[in-house]
Amino acid sequence: MLQIFILAAVAIFLFWRLRAVLGSRDGFEKNIKDINASKKVIKSPDIIEEPSKVNPHDDIFDYVEENSKSAEVFKKMKEFDSDFSVNKFVSGAKMAYEMILMAFENGDTEKLGPLLEHKVLKSFTSVIEKRKKEGLVIEAKFIGMRDIRIIDASFSEKTKVADITLSFKSEISTVVKDAEGSIIEGHPDEIKKQKDTWVFTKDLSEKSPIWLLKSTL
């Protein structure tokens, strides 16, 4: 019995010695918090980050060289017409190209009318009428656009008329049939590569957003 009391007394003595050396768990956690608090980064108040400035001519440089003649022309266009955007123009020209090309191939003069200048419309209509007289029918399908690039641009500060020349590379499928419906040229599954250079024109002083096809080169 005496031996048990002695062992118990030794155990209590060792416990208190360890507590004195190592410290309590609560004290350890408190020290960690103090250390973490000392590591906190002090941020300067009232610092506002200014948003990066956007270059109003970025859309120009997406398509032409920064110091090129065309770049200077586009800057003048934007100075006169703040709504003008090279990105929007190219996007619209892409759609117009497909519409005009397919309308011409399929002989749809009604669709061509609002998109062409008078001289070009007259030329296109003449070719379409000639095909009809010969009994030829063209069935065309637009496959897709491979490339579109701005070749040149001009703007008259006097007349406010702008001309933009673009190069198009596309893929189409065309079949030519005679009056009896027999295929005399092409194949429905044959895809041809098409390359065109077109000039679009617009009076920037007018409210109409439509650019007309001025010529084909």
Tell where the protein language model's regions lie, with residue ranges:
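Structured, amphipathic secondary-structure segments that form assembly/contact surfaces
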Residues: K111-L217
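Juxtamembrane and targeting peptides
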Residues: F5, L14, R19-M95, V176-E180
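Short alpha-helical basic/polar micro-motif
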Residues: Q3, W16, E110, W198
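Core segments of small alpha/beta cavity-forming domains
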Residues: N55-I143
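Feature marks short, highly hydrophobic, charge-poor N-terminal signal-anchor/signal peptide-like helices
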Residues: M1-A8
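Polynucleotide-recognition surfaces of large bacterial nucleic-acid defense/processing enzymes
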Residues: A11
